[in-house]
Swiss-Prot record:
Belongs to the DEAD box helicase family. DDX59 subfamily. Residues 416-579 form the Helicase C-terminal domain. The gene is Ddx59. This is Probable ATP-dependent RNA helicase DDX59. SUPFAM superfamilies: P-loop containing nucleoside triphosphate hydrolases. Its EC number is 3.6.4.13. A motif (Q motif) lies at residues 203-231. Interacts (via HIT-type zinc finger) with the RUVBL1/RUVBL2 complex in the presence of ADP. It comes from Mus musculus. GO terms for cellular component: cytoplasm; nucleus.
Amino acid sequence: MFVPRSLKIKRSSNDDLKSGEAKKSKPEAGGLQVEGDRDTPVHTSVTEEAVTADKPGHASSTNSPSCQLAEVSSTGPDEGVKDSHPSEEPVKSFSKTQRWPEPGEPVCVVCGRYGEYICDKTDEDVCSLECKAKHLLQVKEGEGSLRPSSPQRVAAEPESPLDAFYVYKEHPFIVTLKEDQIETLKQQLGISVQGQDVARPIIDFEHCGFPETLNQNLKKSGYEVPTPIQMQMIPVGLLGRDILASADTGSGKTAAFLLPVIIRAFSEDKTPSALILTPTRELAIQIERQAKELMSGLPRMKTVLLVGGLPLPPQLYRLRQHVKVIIATPGRLLDIIKQSSVSLSGIKIVVVDEADTMLKMGFQQQVLDVLEHTPGDCQTILVSATIPDSIEQLTDQLLHNPVRIITGDKNLPCASVRQIILWVEDPAKKKKLFEILNDQKLFKPPVLVFVDCKLGADLLSEAVQKITGLNSTSIHSEKSQVERRDILKGLLEGDYEVVVSTGVLGRGLDLVNVKLVVNFDMPSSMDEYVHQVGRVGRLGQNGTAITFINNNSKRLFWDVAKRVKPTGSILPPQLLNSPYLHEQKRKEQQKDRQTQNSLVTGANLMDIIRKHEKSSSQK
């Protein structure tokens, strides 16, 4: 069958055969290459015996490739035939029992684990009996040639052309609408667009003319009517334009960029052809899950997830399987690029999701380094919940003749979220949280509680479980990737009534079943506040966000008042009467007046001339 990469064979538990005398020589055709111990001179040979791995004592068939075992023994110059050592480790039956490879070690051509054995039929590396059988079945059925087991650069490789090439054309109904009707529609939906020759918004997914398989996938995934950001962003993206998009959290931005990505990748005959960059593993995992749902049934459409915190070998193995869409965090993708394990020369569309988070987390240079390896003419889409000045600068740097699409207020929380601001001093926070969790009107599990430190998350989760009896857990960056994934799955499936989190769940994740968020600690910026509040109100659903505030957040008082009060929320008197708020307001108004005075307009032109003449006469 195969031999391990050592002198002694790992024998199956029912193998009672004995090895014969051997000489260390190159095997004949059909034999196996075996490496000897360089420190001890030995002579080896290879013989093959048919055994049954699953049924002891059962006669094996020479036609069954998974039942053949190559046997090797070591003898000195004067030694006779000896039995294998009774403690010899048996050949691994299942791939899950094999470890992951270390750098430079052989990799199983089937699953990407450590390639401990060499298949006697193909000379390829495999990790177990299970993968050997799968490997030979693939060869027999002619499903494609196997990839080399060693790390290898994945270049953009051509595939067979698609049977049908998709081209977006405006639906006849959209074409018949007058310009004033389109503008009225945009105003009613809160869509703001800047750019030249911008495509008209769609009103229904059917207006896109997608392949029927994709239309069915949209319905199965619960997409019935496009949201405002989807109405405008999808047709613009389908036409290949660069985009800067901003919308309320939970407004459907992910599907808005996934559909153009899928169509572009589906239409291209090179792999990989699309790249999506995200700041966190959790967000990347979620995006890949949504992408797979929408791609289901589309031929040759594969994704690969390249993120830190998960084993690298299976990611590299998946990358070699002619994937169309790469979903990655910048750091892991850069590592793979530096290993020359992937080429991005065939990329036609790039999406940078949660771009504001990328910049805040210090990933800007990593993003730029990744994009240097993509073609200069590829379509680029920047997506963000907020648009600070740094995003504007990045837009000027990366996008060519972009279309700017904004729905809602680009820096305000989602309108479907009821916001409650409570003045709570630090010693009273736990008591107030327990009151909320015991309030039948407010408590709607699962509840997401945000804190500002990892230790605080663990301690608060334990306190909630002890005092209220609710099933509670904590999640933060020190939890392993497996733990975080299981907690997130449990949150989505309703296994937890309360989840206490640091900012790890504050961005991008679709937690559609969360109806109540409590900001136990006020976020350090209003951008973070917008994102954490946005964990409720997903896709227009109503939700409640309660925030505890006190003088520890005094530098944000005026920002809170400006952004939250217009939504109709009642602010606590301690906040409204705070001297810090009034001082911040005064400084901002003074700065605005200075800016206005520095501008020359028809209204102030004469005043500026008089001031200039007066100052000149005094000199």
